[in-house]
Amino acid sequence: MESFTRAELVAQRDGVWAVCGEVFEAYEKCRMEKGSDPELCLRESTAVVGCSQKVMREIVKNCQKELNESVKCIEENNMRTIPCEEENKAFNECFDKLVAPKFL
């Protein structure tokens, strides 16, 4: 399993949520219904990791340049994304064009 920095996760969050939102919601629902024992929601947790990893691999494969620019800006601004609108816009456009269609 690949590992990502905090800034990479922040930069990718909207794209990952757009594709994996239903999986995330199923996991949260399970946690609310069954409590905090991780084994009770293992299937849902595995689905979250699997979906997220698939999306992030496609982002790295297709939008690496835009991701790097967004991450650099986020890191330079103490993990704040507001000053990085231009970089985030370029990343989101790449995601919408090259990554999202693979999951529709």
From Swiss-Prot:
Lineage of the species this protein comes from: Eukaryota, Amoebozoa, Evosea, Eumycetozoa, Dictyostelia
Motif Cx9C motif 2, chain ranges: 41-51
Function: Accessory subunit of the mitochondrial membrane respiratory chain NADH dehydrogenase (Complex I), that is believed not to be involved in catalysis. Complex I functions in the transfer of electrons from NADH to the respiratory chain. The immediate electron acceptor for the enzyme is believed to be ubiquinone.
Keyword set, alphabetical order: Disulfide bond, Electron transport, Membrane, Mitochondrion, Mitochondrion inner membrane, Repeat, Respiratory chain, Transport
Motif extent (Cx9C motif 1): 20-30
Membrane-protein topology: Peripheral membrane protein
Boundaries of every CHCH domain copy: 17-59, 60-102
Subunit and interaction comment: Complex I is composed of about 45 different subunits.
Disulfide bond residue pairs: C20-C51, C30-C41, C63-C94, C73-C84
Residue span of motif Cx9C motif 4: 84-94
InterPro entries documented for this protein: Ig-like_dom_sf (IPR036179), NDUFA8 (IPR016680)
Species in which this protein is naturally found: Dictyostelium discoideum (Social amoeba)
Similarity field: Belongs to the complex I NDUFA8 subunit family.
Subcellular location: Mitochondrion inner membrane; Mitochondrion intermembrane space
Protein name: NADH dehydrogenase [ubiquinone] 1 alpha subcomplex subunit 8
GO cellular component term, pick one: mitochondrial inner membrane
Statement: the UniProt record of this protein carries the keyword Plastid: no
Transmembrane segments: none
Single biological process term from Gene Ontology: mitochondrial electron transport, NADH to ubiquinone
Domain of life: Eukaryota
Motif Cx9C motif 3 mapped to chain: 63-73
